[in-house]
Design a protein with these regions (language model features):
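Short, low-complexity N-terminal intrinsically disordered segments enriched in polar/charged residues
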Residues: 28-73
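Bacterial N-terminal signal peptides
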Residues: 11-21
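Active-site micro-motifs of SAM-dependent methyltransferase domains
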Residues: 55, 77, 172
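A beta-strand edge to alpha-helix "cap/lid" segment located at domain peripheries
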Residues: 26-40, 105-192
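Bacterial N-terminal signal peptides that target proteins for export
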Residues: 2-13
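A solvent-exposed, acidic/Ser-Thr-rich amphipathic alpha-helical stretch
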Residues: 64-136
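Generic detection of long, well-ordered alpha-helical segments
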Residues: 43, 47, 89-92, 148
Length: 192
């Protein structure tokens, strides 16, 4: 009889422990913010955001402000080389300045004549909206229209706003061993 009571108590304790751990796990999962599912249109819109980015950086229109408009009001851009981030360009004026290559006008951008191509785009839902990784291939470096270079990749955070999908942040992760990003044809007034 004593063994039967002990067995019943042990069984009850095990069932109770399982119930408590299941409840705790469920509560933890409910408390965490789950990524919302992205629609097919969301994926298309994020890809179009990246295509508009390529055009904005290649053509430097509206003195860089068309580029800046691709970011949220508090959005930012930076580069990263060997795990160290460079200047953080945040806010409309600073992002427009980044699009101009820190020059006074779009006529002087160091990458003038380069075409930026983005490939291998991976988009993943996140609690904030989506994250992405995309490789950068540059064509037309150093004034040679046939020179092509892999220039690392971008790590992005995208958010859906009233204006559509925008960059919350974009980090250009330079390719390992890449000393600097190559320049385009020599812009007017810029010494190489």
């Amino acid at each position: 009889m004593k063994n039967r009571i002990t067995t019943t108590r042990v069984s009850t304790a095990i069932v109770l422990a399982l119930a408590v751990s299941t409840a705790v796990a469920s509560a933890r999962q409910s408390a965490g913010v789950r990524p919302s599912a992205l629609t097919t249109q969301d994926y298309i819109d994020i890809q179009q955001l990246n295509a508009r980015y390529a055009v904005a950086i290649d053509e430097c229109t509206n003195n860089g402000y068309d580029y800046a408009a691709l970011y949220t009001d508090d959005g930012w851009f930076t580069t990263s080389r060997n795990g160290r981030q460079g200047t953080r360009w945040q806010g409309r004026d600073k992002l427009a300045e980044a699009a101009r290559g820190n020059m006074k006008s779009c006529d002087e951008v160091p990458w003038k004549g380069i075409k930026h191509m983005y490939v291998n785009h991976v988009i993943v839902p996140s609690p904030e909206g989506a994250t992405g990784r995309i490789d950068l291939i540059a064509i037309g470096l150093d004034g040679d229209p046939h020179k092509v270079e892999h220039q690392g990749h971008y790590e992005d955070v995208y958010v859906k706003t009233a204006k559509g999908w925008l960059f919350k942040s974009r980090i250009h992760m330079l390719a390992p061993g890449q000393a600097a990003v190559s320049s385009g044809s020599k812009p007017t007034g810029v010494k190489k």
